[in-house]
Amino acid sequence: MINRRQALMSTLFGAGYVGLRALATGLPASILLNPRRALAGGPPAGCATTTKAQYILLNTSGNGDPINANVPGTYEDPKITHSLDPAMAPTSLTIQGQTYTAAAPWAALPQSVLDRLCFWHLMTNTPVHPKQPDVLKLMGATQAGEMLPSSLARHLAPCLGTIQSEPISQGASSPSEGLTYGGRALPIIPALALKATLTSPAGALTNLQPLRDQTLNQLYDLYRNGASPAGKAYIDSLVTSQQQVRSIQQGLLNQLTSIKDNTAPSQVLAALALIQMNVTPVIALHIPFGGDNHRDIGLQTETTQTVAGVAAIAGLMAQLASAGLADKVTFVSLDVFGRTLGPANTDGRQHNPNHQVSITIGKSFRAGVIGGVGPVGNDYGALSIDSKTGKAAPNGDIPPVTSLASFGRTMLAGVGLDPAVVSYEVGEGQVIASALA
């Protein structure tokens, strides 16, 4: 009988733990699965999107957090309610030479992060928590009902050479936050489970060096007698030395050992380890930003979690830079809905189907503010967007109801997908050209 650890190892590294062998040797899993073809022909055919391909860290919540209440674009109208806590004081920040106002935590981000930070004012068109999977499917706009993170993962996997094409969910706090791939529900792998599996005395990372030697020995005869000159040169350029393996092993062990729980900072550590092991192109996190705050006296929960949430993003960006991954990873957020903004929301906020703010931080997307917010019904909602400028416009060619699909199209375009593929994967909306770097 397969135990839980074996099942998790198989999920992470594939049958025969080929992904772990790839980590130990430096060789792509595709070579280990079919070494004869790889050795005979040299490097595999290149991916058309390699130069733009990114790992994606998706922050997603079925709670409908009030991110939309404290970002640029919400401070021009004095009737919009903000936390009065000094920690959330309206503060100026500069993005791409333009001055905006946001809650203090956003303004405290390093300028290097602000230079890549974009706020997207969108409409998800639902006030219902369990509709989170539908929002990730762009409310019916995706091909065959695929989730946006899964579509991204499927197209990015061959470009990044990841072990698997399925995304991984670490932070799901409810069933509605789980991911599907091709209609199949995917397992949730919390940070502590990843730590326990990989760092135990008999865990995967403690045996990388012997696994490297064993795998290369198995390939040696084929390498010596069956490899073309191009194949040998390609393999030689990829194989990790024993010293490199020791460095990889110790670095990942140190990183994972520091995980103490399943909170946002621990999810960040686990996600970085998964990227460094090249397991998957897309990892879903849950960083709280106020939660389902119907009753939130003085908006204190919103304040506390926004301060902590932005700090978690700052920590993530610092760790990406330290690991040399700042140009290889894009942070994206997408929640089921936002919260109400009007004057009656000083002690809590209600569900808002008309306004949700997403965030992107990465080299593929231009920093700034996409769209805007204005009065809608009894509260506020996202405004129409001009697809050429990205600005809110009364007669914009992207009405609020297609802003979510347009966001999805722009995400796919940003990581290098061909326009025809983008249109096929997301059948509504438009690419917002000004949002692309």
Language-model segments: residues:
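Feature marks hydrolase-like catalytic cores characterized by long aromatic- and Gly/Pro-rich stretches
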Residues: 85-105, 293-301, 307-437
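Solvent-exposed loop/turn segments at secondary-structure junctions
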Residues: 61-65, 124-128, 172-176, 289-292, ...
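Intrinsic-disorder/low-complexity recognition with aromatic hotspots
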Residues: 27-119
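N-terminal secretory signal peptides and thylakoid transit peptides that target proteins
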Residues: 1-22
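Beta-strand elements within well-structured catalytic alpha/beta cores of enzymes
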Residues: 52-65, 113, 282-288, 313, ...
